[in-house]
Amino acid sequence: MNAILTLLLGIACTCARTPVHAGTSHQTELINRAGNTSLEVDRYARLVELSKLSDVDPQLRIDLNILLPAVDQWANERRNWNPANSSGRKNRFLCGYIQDEWPPPISETSPLYPIWAMYRGRSLIQRPIQSGGIQHNPERRAKYFGEGRRLLGIAREAFPQNKLVRLYLDETFPWPLLNPLDPLAPDWANLQRETLEKLSHIITWWIETRQAPDGQLGGGWGDDVEIWRTWAPVLVGFDDPIAIRGQTNVAEGLFAAEHMKGGYTSYMTDVEHTGEDSGDTCTSMMHLRPDDPVWQARAQRIFELFRDLWTNRNARNQLQFKSTYFTSSEVDTTSQLACDTVYHPRAVQPALLYWQRTADPEMTALFSDWMRTWIAAAAGTERGKPAGIIPSAIHWPSGTVGGLGKNWWDPQNHGESTLYLWPSAMGMMTNTLLLTSHMTGDPSYLEPVRTMAHAREKYLADPTEDPAPGSEAWCASKMRIAETLAKYRLLTGDTTFDPLLLQDANGYVRYRMTGDRKHLIKGLDRSALAFRINRASYMEEVRWTDRQLSFNRNYANHYANPKLPLPTLSALHGAVTGDFGDALYFPMNAVRWKTHARDIGALVTGSGRRNFEAELYHFGNTERNMGAELYLLDKGTYEFTLTDTVGGSSTQTLTVTSPRTQVRFTLSPQRRYTIELRRPS
């Protein structure tokens, strides 16, 4: 590894040659225009123009011939998509070329060197943004960032007008409102619209600018499939045709790939990565096309693999996954890799959603049996684990907590040291336990969630400084189970964990708990803040599609003072859908608005099995015909009341016959509305 880093950081100083003549004034002008523009396609065009000149110095032409293909790769992303590479591994047209020696070196004395440094510097910084192995290793991260910033400093000195270079060197650039504030609209609606409009802008840009004909977005299938998680407030919350088209292209393109013929990937790697291809695509499409038999069958196929291939009974006669590494046809039970983990709900994510919707009895039997294994593991104190704490892994076939690592909290079942280190993806497991309790009616499945919540409350009441790794206090300092507790609160109305939720939950959840809109406004403002600066960090500068919102967290805030706001969309998603958490595990979205996501404010103020309430504000200039598709209401007859704060109320009878009942209505421009559905008294 040291040799690789030496190679990485030494390229710039191993290739000095005799100084190159800068060329004619016209050539110098083209280079300066290429360097100073903040538009990649313009830079490429100026360099192509330079390459067509007949009087270019021979050495400068050599450097240009080296540099121009690299600029082409970065600037003309989708043009480099290759239809022959349907697997996606070779078709990562945004980042597949970023290797240890990219771009190939040119002379430091070349007039093109500052442009070379611009690409080399950004590629070095993008690597830790993407790689957890680098990001979580301070020494390695500092070397990548340090050399990247040094090179970008050279580029900035030569081309001070280039905003992309300056963005990486701690400058911020405003991203103005896409629409002016509406003085008639409530504060929550203006804030929500600001973020929804920009999120819709981002989604549209990605689909229209980067999506290839086969659905890929340039990061490779394994990363492209994750991008819908960012899009969820628009994709799940609204009937937005552009977002739906883009996500459908991703999902159908992925399942058309050869490696998905078995219903799950044929690539052997760990569950965090193998589970994404089918988990993200199938789950998203089950939100968009809940009655489509194709996607239902794909969810059932995953359950079959869970039942017949991936799991068995361990030495303690408990049902568990046999390994962290498996495909659609085989399981690698090498002892080092043989762990069930809190990440494993990802592998069966679509099947869990199918179970939630259908209450399939065989799924109930097997999923609840699997969760019993985790309840038992949480209750024990094996290997020094605190009682009541869910481990991050259970070893196969012994059933002991942890893996082959010397500590229970670090199974060491994967090359990236932090991926399965406790708490790992704990929220996936706690949400699955909550779902199991709901589906079976058995509160014992929530016992690990309760004991962990109490540990968290105890810690917050009297925080321990530097708690010993593996101790209860150490676990409590790291655990993040607020989403599960919030979904439990929405499901049951139980206020037991309200004090903890008021500290850990997002602003929308706090608003629904207390009725205090200051929590809502704070949460929506937090969502909007990050989208007020540095537009390019969400679009043009993203090289790995699973890191679309990671620039501030994974790079900029290592240097920014004050820290830049993080793009946190949980309050936005909650306000639009009524869910107290995300759409991945045990989604409880109450509504999908049957309209596009622009020029609208939609706030769910109440939801449950017997009621639904919301506020709406239409920012447009003409009437808006729209509807609401309602998901949580029990079957029966309801009174639907639409109240216009100017024109009064209208009431009609609505019969709910299925989990997805629609109601249609019309909104007039610049008016506040409330919606209420209740069972007649």
Question: Across the structure, where does each feature detected by a protein language model lie?
Answer:
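A short tyrosine-centered beta-strand micro-motif
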Residues: 636-640, 673
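Bacterial N-terminal signal peptides
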Residues: 2-14
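Glycan-recognition and catalytic cores of secretory/periplasmic carbohydrate-active enzymes
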Residues: 30, 35-46, 50-616, 641
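C-terminal beta-strand-rich structural cap/linker in extracellular carbohydrate-active enzymes
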Residues: 654-681
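Beta-strand-rich interaction surfaces with strong enrichment in secreted/lumenal proteins
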Residues: 602-603, 614-617, 629, 652-654, ...
